[in-house]
A protein has these predicted regions:
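Structural alpha/beta surface segment adjacent to cysteine/selenocysteine redox centers
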Residues: 16-103, 181-185, 193-197, 203
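Short, histidine-centered active-site or binding-site loop motifs used for metal coordination
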Residues: 8, 87, 165
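C-terminal cap of thioredoxin/glutaredoxin-like
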Residues: 97-219
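Local sequence-structure signature of Cys/Sec-based thiol-disulfide redox active-site neighborhoods
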Residues: 1-24
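Conserved aromatic-histidine-acidic binding/catalytic patches
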Residues: 10, 56-57, 170
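Short, contiguous strand/loop micro-motifs
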Residues: 9, 91, 119-120
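Short beta->alpha junction loops/turns
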Residues: 11, 76, 122-125
Length: 219
């Protein structure tokens, strides 16, 4: 059994692709995933309204999603990974939804009360969201974003890596090859970093094949 912690921001397409790769690989490999929030709005100092990265709008929406996820996780006991998946389906996959109604549509899909919409602007959750970031950067360093995976090495040390960043969702066969190779290098005592220039946009719609119920065309 390989145990990892996966940090995510709901607005990040790279994060969504990596997370879908993990969930598919998990069907064929023994992987225990702890899903943890990583608010890019907090990390980039954008809660005050300053658009530092050019992504203020999407990061702000994602931060509000994380507040709702934390509230539901605390009150209903639903795993954060399941909640992230449902909000991600609404945000990235369902073409019928826009920013004004995807919150409510997701709650209805989960059979949860729309009263959780009140948590969107509840700043009481922000200290916990900050703590999750603090925990992540203590292991991985302050110069990382998401997707972020925390592994345990063969020496028992917890190490964090930014990535893997994938342009598209690989096939299951290819995804398993990537996972098996990643575990070998990430959990060994000597590996440090591997990075390349980001020159292409993500193809987040390649994850549609995992959700045929949302992509079927009407007869």
């Amino acid at each position: 059994m390989t145990r990892i912690s996966f940090y995510y921001d709901p607005s990040c397409p790279w994060c969504w692709i990596t997370s879908r790769w993990l969930t598919e690989v998990q069907t064929e490999r023994e992987i225990e995933i702890e899903w943890l929030p990583f608010s890019l709005a907090i990390k980039n100092g954008e809660l005050g309204g300053e658009d530092i990265t050019g992504h203020l709008d999407t990061h702000s929406i994602a931060h509000r999603v994380l507040r709702v996820i934390e509230a539901i996780h605390a009150k209903e006991g639903i795993d954060r990974g399941e909640l992230f998946t449902e909000f991600g389906k609404s945000y990235f996959i369902d073409p019928k939804l826009d920013d004004d109604n995807f919150f409510q549509a997701t709650l209805e899909r989960l059979n949860l009360s729309v009263s959780y919409l009140n948590e969107l602007d509840n700043t009481d959750h922000d200290s916990a969201l900050q703590q999750h970031i603090d925990d992540a950067v203590e292991i991985a360093g302050d110069d990382v974003g998401v997707p972020l995976i925390i592994f345990e090495t063969s020496d028992g040390e917890r190490v964090g890596y930014f990535g893997p960043v994938m342009r598209r969702l690989p096939t299951l066969e290819r995804g398993l090859e990537i996972w098996d190779s990643l575990v070998v290098i990430a959990t060994g005592p000597d590996f440090y970093e591997l990075k390349r220039k980001r020159a292409r946009r993500s193809k987040v719609k390649t994850t549609k094949r995992l959700f045929p119920e949302l992509t079927k065309q009407p007869q």
